[in-house]
Amino acid sequence: MEMAQEQELILVLDFGSQYNQLITRRIREMGVYSELHDHEISVDEIKRMNPKGIILSGGPNSVYEEGSFTIDPEIYNLGIPVLGICYGMQLTTKLLGGKVERANEREYGKAIINAKSDELFFGLPAEQTVWMSHSDKVIEIPDGFEVIADSPSTNYAAIEDKKRRIYGVQFHPEVRHTEYGNDLLRNFVRRVCECTGEWTMENFIDIEVEKIRKRVGDRKVLCAMSGGVDSSVVAVLLHKAIGDQLTCIFVDHGLLRKGEGDMVMEQFGEGFDMNIIRVNAQERFMDKLKGVSDPEQKRKIIGNEFVYVFDDEAAKLTDVDFLAQGTLYTDVIESGTKTAQTIKSHHNVGGLPEDMEFELIEPINTLFKDEVRALGIELGIPEHLVWRQPFPGPGLGIRVLGEITEDKLEIVRESDAILREVVREEGLERDIWQYFTVLPGIQSVGVMGDYRTYDHTVGIRAVTSIDGMTSDFARIDWEVLQKISSRIVNEVDHVNRVVYDITSKPPSTIEWE
């Protein structure tokens, strides 16, 4: 992958740690660009990238297991500072002539270390709390190394070879549980690697615009726009770079939130003066979904039909050379390293036809989600759009459980609009990671006025999370929930009951289908 910035880089090598993305994010938060790459990267490739420093991540393996992950030892002779974290420290010890052995028992959780005031621990207290997670332990350090931190359970909590600027820590500085973890990483990045920290969204835009113009020239780009944050930011960035050479296709499948289709056209078509083709394909999608209740089948139909509609519209355009996509850095990481774990497939509609003769352009594929939001703000996209709720590709199609009908879509659309309005009024938008309503397909007896009803139940799902991999239900104030419930049953036809989902992930997922 081409580096997003022709400037300071901290290279993180992946050994399978669940925290490897966190390392990259922590470095970027310091204003220094960082990328995560497979541990099998060659020395020549590292030389080409010219990083200011290299971090070796942790990992679940033992350095003595058959087939355990390793690196080319020549990396230590490049004159580039190296920091090994947990497995990275054990591997460094082994490759440079020290000794590592299996510990009697796995050390997992908080521990107290005593550190010396050297480059890594500069300005930090001697005694500090760290997060350990390892089953191997260093029993002898290589020649040229000295101990710079110990703990009650290990003499080698941190080590250094100051002359070669090679460091190792047996704990995880990237996690919040490590008291001064960010400070330690900052010391490595700023003091040891001598990075200045000038990576910002503003200079990212300047460099990316220049790259896009250089690559595209006078040719044309096509962008599939969903109205979501990622595709919107991609479209605005491309428009800033190449103007009228960009055409966006917005497929309105009728499964959008209330007013969303019109909002896309107003905010981006008119507000940014972009060329957007809106395809009203509601009837086409509903015909295909008629009688279908299985969630996987619904996803497949919606995804395939999106491709067919997009393909039909793209075929009407001439002289288009590039197809733009809102691929994020997390997608690149998950598909690009040998240590990546297979996870549940994303809801986002993908799989555009392989026979489309376009070059792919992915201008935000080096950014995490929060960085994409920051980029959107820097590009002038209104804050309320940048911070909109995540929305799955199949849209409301997976928030209506069972068969989809226009009446059911209307219930979800209206109830969801009420939920979002109340959350906004109460100032909870940034406190709740994701929130929406679902129609679970349950009808129950109720009383409205003097009449008996037998109507639908609406479920409210609201969760707190950091990255969506795990989540807990949001502790919304009861009075706020009561306000939401009262408005839904009074303002949305055919609803007489509202329930609140108090399940965490795992065991449940955030979406119901």
Swiss-Prot record:
Pfam families: GATase, GMP_synt_C, tRNA_Me_trans. GO terms for molecular function: ATP binding; GMP synthase activity. Keywords: ATP-binding, Glutamine amidotransferase, GMP biosynthesis, Ligase, Nucleotide-binding, Purine biosynthesis. GO terms for cellular component: cytosol. Catalyzes the synthesis of GMP from XMP. It comes from the Bacteria. Residues 199-388 form the GMPS ATP-PPase domain. The gene is guaA. The keyword Nucleus does not apply. This is GMP synthase [glutamine-hydrolyzing]. PANTHER family: GMP SYNTHASE [GLUTAMINE-HYDROLYZING], GMP SYNTHASE-RELATED. NCBIfam families: guaA_Cterm, guaA_Nterm, PRK00074.1. It catalyses: XMP + L-glutamine + ATP + H2O = GMP + L-glutamate + AMP + diphosphate + 2 H(+). PROSITE patterns: GATASE_TYPE_1 (PS51273), GMPS_ATP_PPASE (PS51553). The active site is at C86, H172, E174. It is an enzyme of class 6 (ligase). ATP binds at S226, G227, G228, V229, D230, S231, S232. Its EC number is 6.3.5.2.
